[in-house]
Amino acid sequence: MSGAVCPGSFDPVTLGHIDVFERAAAQFDEIVVAVMVNPNKSGMFTLDERIALIEESTTHLPNLRVESGQGLIVDFVRERGLTAIVKGLRTGTDFEYELQMAQMNKHVAGIDTFFVATAPSYSFVSSSLAKEVAMLGGDVTALLPAAVNTRLTAKLAERG
């Protein structure tokens, strides 16, 4: 059985992320979305909110589960008996950074990374950009799953 992890902060999860999850789920028996905790960052959504939003947005993927993690992603992979890391790439800049990380993960732990080129319709989408556009009153319905859009709108209204 082959399994892979899709790591990230997912603050919040976007349709670009969902596209990568769907494509990874078609290639591996099991996908674990690892919502990684960075103690140096405070996100808009709590860890539990991010997990719930991903779960709600991926109910159509029976071989996908969502967990939290922190520390080295290679430790997360090994602890769960997974075999690979899957990362989405939007731009050449993403590739340069992710290639370095992939080479380090291979060197340190022998774990391979598989890159998925983001669909052109999502190549410009990022969590940060979606939040920024939403904060300025823009329409982000084409960037986010419906549940995420609803929760983001509510969270921005709470903040005033």
Swiss-Prot record:
The record marks H17 as: Transition state stabilizer. Keywords: ATP-binding, Coenzyme A biosynthesis, Cytoplasm, Magnesium, Nucleotide-binding, Nucleotidyltransferase, Transferase. Its main location: cytoplasm. Substrate binds at S9, K41, I73, K87. Its cofactor is Mg(2+). It holds the Pfam family CTP_transf_like. Pathway: Cofactor biosynthesis; coenzyme A biosynthesis; CoA from (R)-pantothenate: step 4/5. PANTHER family: PHOSPHOPANTETHEINE ADENYLYLTRANSFERASE. This is Phosphopantetheine adenylyltransferase. Reversibly transfers an adenylyl group from ATP to 4'-phosphopantetheine, yielding dephospho-CoA (dPCoA) and pyrophosphate. Homohexamer. GO terms for cellular component: cytoplasm. The keyword rRNA processing does not apply. The lineage of its organism: Bacteria, Bacillati, Actinomycetota, Actinomycetes, Mycobacteriales.
